């Protein structure tokens, strides 16, 4: 039996879809979320086999959430959409499934059957990844009991520690459910250390230390370590040959 997560900002839609999925006997709904930010957190925590994802949600859409998922651990995704026939055709052309609101029980059963018979997770993931945005314009974060949507261009660095991944701008630091790998691949942040990414435009100076190590000082005075492995690449990106 496949496990599923339902993400939709409409409570009735979540409840109705959860009931319909339970009635199929092939899906165990292990959670739901009212927005994409909480949804991403639950995807990382619960690791469902399938995510039924609404497209039109406030702040972060379903399409944007798709681009925030780690491609190495991405679940099956089925869009739940009220889009018109032209948009639906576009999803079909990409060999990607969808459910049209209001969800038709028979159509849902066909979707579940198709998922159950999927030849491999990797094959479907390739279709999912092909629809994901190549870059992220915003990063959903949680800080001080509030949801923060941080513009990617305002971020000076991102780093991970025992408590998770954190994103820092000139004005604030907040936690995100996105991995450093996703941030590295889909933003302009550059790897400078196993646990740190840096924005080139945020660099004020680089202090060269002993043993081939270095330390970046950002324009706001934040200190970011640079490992030997990434120092040469960083110099090249700054136009320094030595």
From Swiss-Prot:
Gene Ontology terms, MF aspect: phosphorelay response regulator activity; transcription cis-regulatory region binding
Any Pfam family the entry gives: LytTR
Disulfide partners: none
UniProt domain Response regulatory: residue ranges: 3-116
Gene Ontology biological process terms, A to Z: regulation of DNA-templated transcription
4-aspartylphosphate PTM positions: 54
Domain HTH LytTR-type: 139-240
Keyword flag Transmembrane helix: no
Keyword annotations from UniProtKB, A to Z: DNA-binding, Phosphoprotein, Transcription, Transcription regulation, Two-component regulatory system
PANTHER family, per database record: REGULATOR OF RPOS, TRANSCRIPTIONAL REGULATORY PROTEIN BTSR
Name of the protein this chain belongs to: Uncharacterized response regulatory protein VV1_0503
Native organism taxonomy: Bacteria, Pseudomonadati, Pseudomonadota, Gammaproteobacteria, Vibrionales
């Amino acid at each position: 039996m496949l496990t599923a997560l339902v993400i939709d900002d409409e409570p009735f839609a979540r409840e109705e879809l959860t009931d319909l999925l339970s009635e199929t006997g092939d899906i165990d709904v292990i959670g739901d979320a009212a927005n994409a930010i909480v949804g991403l957190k639950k995807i990382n925590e619960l690791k469902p086999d399938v995510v039924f994802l609404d497209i039109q949600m406030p702040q972060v859409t379903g399409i944007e959430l798709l681009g925030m998922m780690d491609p190495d651990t991405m679940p099956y995704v089925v869009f739940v959409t009220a889009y018109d026939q032209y948009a639906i055709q576009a999803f079909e052309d990409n060999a990607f499934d969808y459910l049209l609101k209001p969800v038709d029980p028979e159509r849902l059963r066909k979707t579940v059957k198709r998922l159950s018979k999927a030849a491999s997770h990797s094959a479907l993931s390739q279709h999912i990844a092909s629809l994901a945005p190549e870059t992220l314009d915003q990063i959903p974060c949680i800080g001080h009991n509030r949801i923060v949507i941080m513009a990617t261009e305002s971020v000076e660095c991102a780093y991970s520690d025992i408590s998770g991944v954190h994103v820092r701008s000139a004005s604030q630091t907040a936690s995100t459910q996105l991995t450093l790998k996703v941030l590295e691949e889909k933003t302009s942040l550059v790897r400078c250390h196993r646990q740190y990414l840096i924005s080139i435009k945020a660099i004020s100076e680089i202090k060269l230390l002993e043993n081939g190590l270095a330390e970046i000082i950002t324009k706001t005075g934040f200190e970011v370590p640079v490992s030997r492995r990434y120092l040469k690449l960083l110099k090249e990106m700054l136009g320094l040959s030595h």
